[in-house]
Amino acid sequence: MQHIRNFSIIAHIDHGKSTLADRLIHFCGGLSDREMEAQVLDSMDLERERGITIKAQTAALHYKAKDGQVYNLNLIDTPGHVDFSYEVSRSLSACEGALLVVDASQGVEAQTVANCYTAIEQNVEVVPVLNKIDLPAADPESARKEIEDVIGVDASEAVLCSAKTGLGIEDVLETVVRRVPPPKGDPDAPLKALIIDSWFDNYVGVVMLVRVVDGVLKPKDRILLMANGAQYPCDQVGVFTPRSVARPQLSAGEVGFIIAGIKELQAAKVGDTVTLAMRPASEPLPGFKEIKPQVFAGLYPVESSEYDQLRDSLEKLRLNDASLQYEPEVSQALGFGFRCGFLGLLHMDIVQERLEREFDMNLITTAPTVVYEVVMNSGEVIRVENPAKLPDQSKIAEIREPIITATIFLPQDYVGPVITLCNLKRGAQVDMRYHGRQVQLIYDLPMNEVVMDFFDKLKSVSRGYASLDYEFKEYRAADLVKLDLLVGGEKVDALSVIVHRASAQYRGREVAAKLRGLIPRQMFDVAIQSAIGSHIVARETIKALRKNVLAKCYGGDISRKKKLLEKQKEGKKRMKQVGNVEIPQEAFLAVLRVDEGK
């Protein structure tokens, strides 16, 4: 065990985690030159295209150090995006060390700080690595100073490397061997293994990625999952080098996989403890906190006949993504669909894209909303995640909205516009600190303002330089109202949103105007109205298309023309009573993108 080192790589998006992982794998001979490809550990097409890591991946490497010993290094690559921060905390709980990768030309950014604090909380040895030192803009000294100022980690021995050119990779490995402590654990104690991740494989069933803390596991052993008491025969154990390689056993301190013919992913919950049925451990390992979805949206198939297919697709996605939650719901406007819970907007975007890509679904998505706490007059508190389910205003004592604490890092040139943006979004400034050229702003912001379009706005006012990290703080009472949209006098439940009273009227006008341009003209007038309760705050009318019924009258008596016009008017009136208006998918998206910064 003295020769095992478990470490993960943490960094902000685009600071070069995955490239560094590639270099380390290549250097240790995990893959030959022919098999090597960029971002080996990002196995999803989507991860490659967007250049982000979504699922944590592992690789077991052999490294012959300068002291002549051969070390087993278990590398875990983690995501950097704020939506997937729970993936990071899971990966860190399996490690004794973490490489904190900082781009030498960019310095410290928001997720660097967040992930680093997660590591420090879990008592993981943090090893700073300054990457991209081959760039002309690299400034390792100021990056070093920022690490010490902002995070408070000693960076005097930070390793300088360039993952792209392979410069300094050996120094990184030597530092890992020297500074990361070997795992503690007792190979003779009863088996305890923590499930870090689990996913579904079509051939072998559920694959569990585990960190063995105590004991030894061999194929043919009967394993017991401590959360639900289920037992399974273990078929195969092994490690990823990133390819899966079977091993005769997994022992204390190692990170590897277990295949035990488990059919449903819900059985192998992440954070559960695996032990032996014959000789179980007395108590499970401390798991992870259950993650709660922050953002909800309705997903509906465009063709109602595809409802079952959507349900199957969501079930399959859930096999790989335990944080996705969904339940069936019915909308008068869109028919049958699902209310899905996501970790954040990026997560929602990715789930939607995977459904469209991997399962060929055509989807309509409603506006994302957050969970509100509604206090009724009776004193009862209910949670509302769908604006259409908000109780009648007369029964409500108060509505509380979720508040998040956002940490924003940005160059000081952009402080003005970013503060203006935060104030527009009803933010309250908590703190502001200067670190060299960088500024750290801390704001309390209402979550529903962030869900709408805060992230895109932040990027545009700071020219892409600002980075954001946020965490949930509390529920706070606010003056919120439900804004309904009526098309042709009918409420369209899927277009309802909960907004702050101060911006309700403005928003109602904006949405109505936007819908007017998107709903195609009909043969009759269509009124689009925004309403708060029974109070109409805005109205737009889509004018009817009409045929010129007088075209065939040449001269002749006026009464003949009047008769034709009256007949047309009657027809339009009748159409208006029975006609219904189809609302295109763009209209649902337009409600999200009502631009408040005009």
Curated annotation (Swiss-Prot):
Protein topology in the membrane: Peripheral membrane protein
Keyword GTP-binding: yes
EC category name: hydrolase
Catalytic activity, as annotated: GTP + H2O = GDP + phosphate + H(+)
Domain tr-type G: 2-184
PROSITE patterns: G_TR_1 (PS00301), G_TR_2 (PS51722)
Transmembrane segments: none
Positions of GTP binding: 14-19, 131-134
Subcellular location: Cell inner membrane
Name of one Pfam family that matches: LepA_C
Gene3D superfamilies, per the entry: 3.30.70.240, Elongation factor 4, C-terminal domain, Elongation Factor G (Translational Gtpase), domain 3, P-loop containing nucleotide triphosphate hydrolases, Translation factors
Enzyme Commission number(s) from the entry: 3.6.5.n1
Family: Belongs to the TRAFAC class translation factor GTPase superfamily. Classic translation factor GTPase family. LepA subfamily.
Protein name stated in the entry: Elongation factor 4
Gene that this sequence comes from: lepA
